[in-house]
From Swiss-Prot:
Disulfide bonds join C7-C28, C13-C33, C17-C35. This is Potassium channel toxin alpha-KTx 4.6. GO terms for cellular component: extracellular region. Negative results: has no effects on Kv1.1/KCNA1, Kv1.4/KCNA4, Kv1.5/KCNA5, Kv11.1/KCNH2, KCa3.1/KCNN4, BK/KCNMA1, and Nav1.5/KCNA5 (when tested at 10 nM).
Length: 37
């Protein structure tokens, strides 16, 4: 699931995903965070 968070690298998305979906799993795609439920 894509969240409305910009990123330059996948590690930036982990805390954002944890905040958004409660799980620190995801990666940076095309400058946006994609989180895995």
């Amino acid at each position: 699931v894509f969240i409305n968070a910009k990123c330059r690298g996948s590690p930036e998305c982990l805390p954002k995903c944890k905040q958004a979906i409660g799980k620190a799993a995801g990666k940076c795609m095309n400058g946006k965070c994609k989180c895995y439920p």
